């Protein structure tokens, strides 16, 4: 039973904690927060042992009546691996100041830069490369979504180049500080955006084949991607078939009422998903088209949750718990109730 410490019980951390708890071969030994808020209180209510992420802040939790077990240095020795879910940029400091110092394996999230880790993880593409490694980055929600779709396409034809426009949500639903409220913002205003090179850290052979551009729009529910992928030749039916055969990606039909990110989120609610999480990538079947060997399709990405199962598989890879990535994917999917 792998002992997992979650450093940062926020949007990603609380989801990773719940996902770890669902597995038969791993357990959460503790979660951390930097300050006492409702999430810290909820962690304790859910039965997680709570630790301060910052040494010396334990009294702040005690003053708020939140049961605190100590700080991260009181628990880290017991961990086999740490899943770092701190805000972007903090993970780099934690690698140097905590994980390397205590000789602990750690997974950081996509907000960290690739040069600070040994490799970038995706369950389909880089499980074998990350096997037994010490410091790995689980790539961002957008990169995860693109990697899954490109895997499906690559399984049925050779990819010559990919062009992707990312329509990004302005903020997460719980974030009242970000925006925009009444604007469409090129982010970044330069092309390419960082998303293409990030895909290249997972799939080195695509490094010079993918170019991305990104904009932010006033919505909170999901991102959207519009892909244009030039190939050596395929058909619409072959692409759809490849999508249906690839784990954690599936087709949805606008004709059936799933015609927007709003209705997709409603679908996630209706099937009983916690926090309406959609761990899979939905691709609109009607959007799939092939013109002169170029594939066109549109997909949605639930930014709060699609990376969660990847973190679970990454734990197994780094701790050498399972050699076969497909077996790990199947274990994770079954435990979490992922559609396929």
From Swiss-Prot:
Ligand binding (NAD(+)): 11-12, 111, 169, 303
Gene Ontology biological-process entries: glycolytic process
EC number: 1.2.1.59
Catalytic residue list: 141 (nucleophile)
Pfam families, sorted: Gp_dh_C (PF02800)
Gene Ontology cellular component list: cytoplasm
Alphabetically ordered keywords of this record: Cytoplasm, Glycolysis, NAD, NADP, Oxidoreductase
Subunit structure: Homotetramer.
Similarity annotation: Belongs to the glyceraldehyde-3-phosphate dehydrogenase family.
Protein name in UniProt: Glyceraldehyde-3-phosphate dehydrogenase
